[in-house]
Amino acid sequence: MKKIWVILFVIFFFVGFAVTQESQSQHTVYVECGALWDVKSEKLIPKVRIAVSLPDGKIAAVQPHQPGILLGVASGTIENIDLSKETCLPGLIDTHTHVLLQGDITDVDYDFQLLKESPEYRTIVATVNARRALEYGFTAIRDLETEGAGYADVDVKKAIENGVVPGPRMQVATRALNVTGAYPLEGYAPNVPVPHGVQVVDGPEEARKAVREQILYGADWIKVYADRNYRVREDGVLDDIPTFTMDELRAIVDEAHRERHKVASHAMALHGVHNSVEAGVDSIEHGAYIADEDLKTMVAHDTFYVPTIFVFEYVAQGRAAEGATVWPKMLKIHEDTFRRALKAGVKIAFGTDAGGFAWTENPAQEFSYMVKYGMTPAQAIRAATVSASELLGMQDKIGTIEPGKFADIVAVLGDPLADVRVLEKVDFVMKGGMVYKKP
């Protein structure tokens, strides 16, 4: 009998200890918002309380604020965050960045980064850029290639996920793909070996092998450069030289999709866009000119359009001064394309090409340009939340503020529906229940 009591005591002691430890680890954070912009209903809801459970970092409840009534509490400690003077939104998503790129190439030559900065140095700088992205309010990014730094983006992503450095959620495209002669460092003798900003492939089999290799080493996306050498024709169409053959492009898309990965295409003009859409890519990046027939195909195939407007405005004059006079002409063409895509019902996701301009510039300036080009503020915000999360395949995890999703929350003073520029002044950032910036 005594032996039975000893056994029962040991069982109850350890069960009680486990329960105590579990309750101690549970923590609920209440975010008291002056208003919440519901990106799904497109309504501004006043006085909302968001319950965030830790350590899982997910939203437990979203309810109108009622003093004295605490929702979503299982057990454990409670913390309150007062944002009663602010408007809360889902964490913003930038679907086109380059944390390993230095900025406008008219300020610093592209050669400089590839020839004079080591991948190690660039990776350190990339962690700073990733933190900047987060503090700007971007809790998730899709980083579209390292520009000659190999698989360094995979390690930046890993360091963020392991809590080594702060940064947004990342999907990465590693090295990107192009053909011989289409993405070179120019002006060097043929006998001088110089690095490439991309992985060079020629022929369908090389292309397939490169896709497999990049996925093996951590690529979430495959990126292709589909065109080059731009000119404006007399009829106003932005013309180009396509890089890949259709066989090559189809092989890349087929191999990526077979491996359940998506393909992003840098496609600026007529042929690059058309070939990419016909090959079945998942997103068109930049798309300064897209023919109406290709817009129809994009709608039919659910192909996303990531217009990256701000970077065009940012670099156009500098590139024109260097002799690329096509760039200022692109601006009007780009605006017309954006308006036609919007009218046609193409899915548009927010993306900035940050790194193509200096990271000291706030990527949220893209919102103002999207509105200037024809979107409402509500549509622009949706592009950076709901639509962007769908492009990333993370719509069940991020993009809206609702129970079960990660607590990725930002807040601003003022009403972004009245003035979208307030999104350039995010002063509260939470990612996965952890606060990275507060008023």
Regions found by a protein language model. Give the residues of each.
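Metal-associated gating/positioning segment near the N- to mid-region
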Residues: 83-158, 162, 247, 279
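His/Asp/Glu-enriched, well-ordered alpha-helical/loop segment
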Residues: 112-114, 258, 330-416
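Bacterial N-terminal signal peptides
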Residues: 6-16
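Histidine/acidic residue-rich metal-binding segments in metalloenzymes
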Residues: 155, 205-226, 230-305, 329-348
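Histidine/acidic-residue-rich catalytic or RNA/ligand-binding cores of hydrolases
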Residues: 104-106, 153, 182, 232-234, ...
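Active-site gating loops and adjacent loop-to-helix segments of metal-dependent hydrolytic enzymes
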Residues: 100-122, 180-195, 230-244, 300-331
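Histidine-rich, glycine-flanked metal-binding segment
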Residues: 36, 41-89, 112
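Divalent metal-dependent hydrolysis catalytic cores, especially in the metallo-beta-lactamase
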Residues: 125-151, 166-176, 219-229, 262, ...
